[in-house]
Amino acid sequence: MRPSMLLGVVAAVYVGSVVGVIVRADDHGKKDDDSRVRIGLKYAKDQGINLSVKGRDRETVGLGSYLVNAVGGCNDCHTAPPYTQDPTAFLGAPKQVNIACYLAGGQEFGPFVVSRDITPFEDGKPAGLTWKQFLHVIRTGEDPENPGQLLQVMPWPVYQAMSDDDLRAIYEYLSAIPPVPVNVCGVPSE
């Protein structure tokens, strides 16, 4: 084999392997997104969270469920108490979300701070916030009820680094969960 021909074969193999790695990386990323969507939708179903996906992108809602429930731990602060009281919980029983107060706020952090209701209000918007308002709160930490003041407990500095697409998925998921009636869980809805 001539040197120029050998060089051509080596170059073709190299380019083919690089393209193959890039394609596999893209496939893996897509599969990763798909698996996060599946995990999010399965979690909601397993916990009895009835999602209203009509008119919404199911994959976006599923990704939002994954981010809210598996990554963000929003239930830990925005539900009081976060899980049902199962006496066998420490013996390996599966945890069960407190569905009656799911994300309706009411968790106390000292004498002056209580977590907010982030379920959809009567207008269908989570916490009564438009997408633009929600994005502003997450990006700046500014309290929507007290402009110029920061949210005291909310870990917004962590969430502000998320992509707009991820935050949109969270917003769409919060729009798709059931609202909780006013004053059911100790925190009035607006």
Residue locations for each model-derived region?
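N-terminal export/targeting leaders of redox proteins
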Residues: 1-49
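Electron-transfer interface patches adjacent to heme c in soluble/periplasmic c-type cytochromes
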Residues: 28, 93-133, 157-167
